[in-house]
């Protein structure tokens, strides 16, 4: 399959993101994964960390992962990040239809995404599934289902723990935690 794109706020990136991406590499014949931080997600509140800080956290988290890269087209556009618009750019830049890694929850609501009908014509999807949920298959979407490890960690929980002075050891890479503490990110979020 080659390459895939893993979009998200990454506010902050955590071990769950990294392990899911590694599982996709191993289970779905993907050589490279480009983590693609959204400037602003159309479905989430504005990130707390700045685009520059989230990019730096990704760099620190992924620097020892030879299969992991960062694609910053959405950060550079400085607008709400719509997957369809990014897919058009990625298709031209990489000369192939982009493959996006999405969670099963996102797959179930894909029809609510901006220009969904156009998106599914130009992009492929790897749907990461945790556990034994029944699979609903939408035949309009070119998707591969990938059972990944269940890692119950969320960026929201990490931000709250940091805000209240609780440990996030083993939840995020040490270098990312050092950066967060040095920058004072999430201390008063």
From Swiss-Prot:
Q: Which UniProt keywords are listed?
A: ATP-binding, NAD, Nucleotide-binding, Nucleotidyltransferase, Pyridine nucleotide biosynthesis, Transferase
Q: Which PANTHER family match?
A: NICOTINATE-NUCLEOTIDE ADENYLYLTRANSFERASE-RELATED (PTHR39321), PHOSPHOPANTETHEINE ADENYLYLTRANSFERASE (PTHR39321:SF3)
Protein origin, superkingdom: Bacteria
The record, for InterPro entries, names: Cyt_trans-like (IPR004821), NadD/NMNAT (IPR005248), Rossmann-like_a/b/a_fold (IPR014729)
Q: In which pathway does it act?
A: Cofactor biosynthesis; NAD(+) biosynthesis; deamido-NAD(+) from nicotinate D-ribonucleotide: step 1/1
State what this protein does.
Answer: Catalyzes the reversible adenylation of nicotinate mononucleotide (NaMN) to nicotinic acid adenine dinucleotide (NaAD).
**SUPFAM superfamilies assigned to the protein according to its UniProt record, in alphabetical order:** Nucleotidylyl transferase
Molecular-function GO term, any one = ATP binding
Q: Which residues form a coiled coil?
A: none
Q: What is its EC number?
A: 2.7.7.18
CDD domains linked: NMNAT
> Know the name of this protein?
Probable nicotinate-nucleotide adenylyltransferase
What protein family is recorded? Belongs to the NadD family.
- UniProt catalytic activity: nicotinate beta-D-ribonucleotide + ATP + H(+) = deamido-NAD(+) + diphosphate
Note the Pfam families from the entry: CTP_transf_like
Could you give a single Gene Ontology term from the biological process aspect? NAD biosynthetic process
Q: Which species is this UniProt entry from?
A: Hydrogenobaculum sp. (strain Y04AAS1)
């Amino acid at each position: 399959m080659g390459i895939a794109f893993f979009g998200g706020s990454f506010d902050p990136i955590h071990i769950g993101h990294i392990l899911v991406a590694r599982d996709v590499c191993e289970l779905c014949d993907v050589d490279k994964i480009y983590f693609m931080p959204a400037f602003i997600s159309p479905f989430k509140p504005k990130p707390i960390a700045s685009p520059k800080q989230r990019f730096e956290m990704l760099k620190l988290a992924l620097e020892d992962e030879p299969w992991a890269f960062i694609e910053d087209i959405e950060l550079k556009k400085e607008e709400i990040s719509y997957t369809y618009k990014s897919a058009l750019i990625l298709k031209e830049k990489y000369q192939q239809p982009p493959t996006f890694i999405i969670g099963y929850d996102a797959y179930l609501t894909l029809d609510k995404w901006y220009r969904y009908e156009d998106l599914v014509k130009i992009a492929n999807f790897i749907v990461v599934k945790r556990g034994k949920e029944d699979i609903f298959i939408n035949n309009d979407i070119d998707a591969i289902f990938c059972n990944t490890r269940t890692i119950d960690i969320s960026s929201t929980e990490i931000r709250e723990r940091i805000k209240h002075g609780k440990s996030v050891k083993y939840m995020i890479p040490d270098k990312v935690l050092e950066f967060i503490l040095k920058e004072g990110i999430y201390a008063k979020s």
